[in-house]
Amino acid sequence: MDVVDPDIFNRDPRDHYDLLQRLGGGTYGEVFKARDKVSGDLVALKMVKMEPDDDVSTLQKEILILKTCRHANIVAYHGSYLWLQKLWICMEFCGAGSLQDIYQVTGSLSELQISYVCREVLQGLAYLHSQKKIHRDIKGANILINDAGEVRLADFGISAQIGATLARRLSFIGTPYWMAPEVAAVALKGGYNELCDIWSLGITAIELAELQPPLFDVHPLRVLFLMTKSGYQPPRLKEKGKWSAAFHNFIKVTLTKSPKKRPSATKMLSHQLVSQPGLNRGLILDLLDKLKNPGKGPSIGDIEDEEPELPPAIPRRIRSTHRSSSLGIPDADCCRRHMEFRKLRGMETRPPANTARLQPPRDLRSSSPRKQLSESSDDDYDDVDIPTPAEDTPPPLPPKPKFRSPSDEGPGSMGDDGQLSPGVLVRCASGPPPNSPRPGPPPSTSSPHLTAHSEPSLWNPPSRELDKPPLLPPKKEKMKRKGCALLVKLFNGCPLRIHSTAAWTHPSTKDQHLLLGAEEGIFILNRNDQEATLEMLFPSRTTWVYSINNVLMSLSGKTPHLYSHSILGLLERKETRAGNPIAHISPHRLLARKNMVSTKIQDTKGCRACCVAEGASSGGPFLCGALETSVVLLQWYQPMNKFLLVRQVLFPLPTPLSVFALLTGPGSELPAVCIGVSPGRPGKSVLFHTVRFGALSCWLGEMSTEHRGPVQVTQVEEDMVMVLMDGSVKLVTPEGSPVRGLRTPEIPMTEAVEAVAMVGGQLQAFWKHGVQVWALGSDQLLQELRDPTLTFRLLGSPRLECSGTISPHCNLLLPGSSNSPASASRVAGITGL
């Protein structure tokens, strides 16, 4: 560690101060509220952890600036301590917090309040600049207010001396949204001076008026790129009629693009906005009173007008009509439906285990379907009743007991529907196969194959008429195969009209959940609960959902709008509402803005459709939205835990929009959005009609093609796109060429397939009355489930719902493995089982 300033005390600051609470984090460390043990005065202690090889020159610079700055608008410095590899900086405590903390509760400041703040900040900047210092990070979060309503500049972690040889800084530092153009282009233009603080003050004035700086929903790297362009226009206030001409002029002058023409802090103090009479601390005291009593003032609402939220007509909690296992084991009465389930070539299986095993979460796209084809697994149908052809049917098991004593039922017991369970359906249990037939045990003795923990439908109630109970069928020879249950029931009697689903794992409990976007709102289903229950999270029509990093994106509202929700916040609000039921009030009327769990994404009103694709290896996933006259592309930005705007292309989309999917190619920085597909030319299986974001102008193919039946485009790998078109499924590259290495890149469907999904390296095709499973890259039909009394519907590309042809209610099922997150986002349902 470098030599520390001699004025830094080498002792524990806690000998002099009592730490009261953590206030937050600064540029280099954490900030605590503390009390002087002698005087009782409150102070702020900034703690920075040090490493032996750390260069403390930057921190010494901050300390030096604080020590040498004595001004009414700059936080006072009280001393520094170095103890146990931690540097503590003691400074003035501002009890009201930062302006950012304040406006997130109170809403935007009035023009007079903004004028007073700007005047006080300009006075502090004029002093700093006279001392040859630049702040370089002026923003709402670094402007503090004390309990007396006084304004203080804080956080000098990136301040710099302006010496005779350092008049032009050559470092790239600051916050992009508040950054001056010359700072963003420092590598091109050669440096900047103290006037960059004037630009930041102008952006801060807009922030206080509009609750966020301009371009705040745009990716920060995109903001830097825009500011370095020659055609960049400085931002202005959005609502011209709301603010005075003096305020508009103040913004125009402070945001002068050329630093040579931008006025200094001293000159700006004579501006009409900040020199008007009536600017005093009373304006800020009124703001603090509103902060302490938010109910007195008007509600802050959202950035845009909220649609009126009406009490939902559907209950907030919906219980399954039958209890189901937390592992998703199907109800035993599933066996009572006459499903035709054809065993096709290569599908001999062994009897499965009678319990499911939870698997660790896995990303669907992290495993290649083609690689999965060559893998082997001992997992079998451990969660489903398997109908088989009559000629292969083993002796039937007795009917399921209804948890009555054995003497209450005989061997001829009837099912719930008054009919004997069909013998064509069987359920297998785990256990060693019998070596030879032998008499069954007496009623008081447990079966070697069935125990009290076995599935109730497998129990064999003792009979007074039979000498021995029927034996379980012997195990067949194991055939190594990939896959598990085709459908696993999760919920019975779902009344929701579901449009989309997403999977989510709770970060603390690790419980797996399903998030459902429906006409009635957003609901959640905990797959680990003993009793399946759907609980409402958001009472607004939702047609699309997607979860990432505990954030739920949704397309919600009567007029569709893209929303961002905190899933943990939605759950907490649900529990609060359940514990204290009150009249339905929009959450925006109850919560501070910083605590809002549901916020609208700006400029996405009227969004027609959304889709998501994985980003490049260095970036997060992309989200694309189809607006009325344009297409917007957003990308996940991990430091801010949100999607930010990357590009927007003005383009009139077709109506109806039958295809809307993102396509990413190897080496491409930005994806293209596919809005149509047609048969290809020689050498190409299909021709994608795309809108490209990277080119100067977008390209669109001929859109006059009419298709026979549904059309679907889904990218399943970086170099593989699955296209359902004209009754067949084609596996092509993002350019439309057939995928190499596949025996059959085009699979003709034998039914009127409406949607397809890739599950566990196999192709699942869903049609009106059934499901087909095809081998990837071949015309081999591996498995089929059909029932003319049921209607299946795929929710999105990898999601399934199945309902009765008459009843509007449905049961939720999972296709594929019952516990993998890949199958967790595929939901199905069956009625009348």
From Swiss-Prot:
EC number(s) given by UniProt: 2.7.11.1
UniProt feature, compositional bias: Pro residues: 431-445
Compositionally biased spans, kind Acidic residues: 376-385
Phosphothreonine sites (modified residues): T165, T175, T355
Domain of life: Eukaryota
Cofactor(s) recorded in Swiss-Prot or TrEMBL: Mg(2+)
Function of the molecule: Serine/threonine-protein kinase, which plays a role in the response to environmental stress. Appears to act upstream of the JUN N-terminal pathway. Activator of the Hippo signaling pathway which plays a pivotal role in organ size control and tumor suppression by restricting proliferation and promoting apoptosis. MAP4Ks act in parallel to and are partially redundant with STK3/MST2 and STK4/MST2 in the phosphorylation and activation of LATS1/2, and establish MAP4Ks as components of the expanded Hippo pathway. May play a role in hematopoietic lineage decisions and growth regulation.
Assembly and interaction partners: Interacts with MAP3K1. Interacts with FBXW8. Interacts with CLNK (via its SH2 domain).
Protein name stated in the entry: Mitogen-activated protein kinase kinase kinase kinase 1
Origin species: Homo sapiens
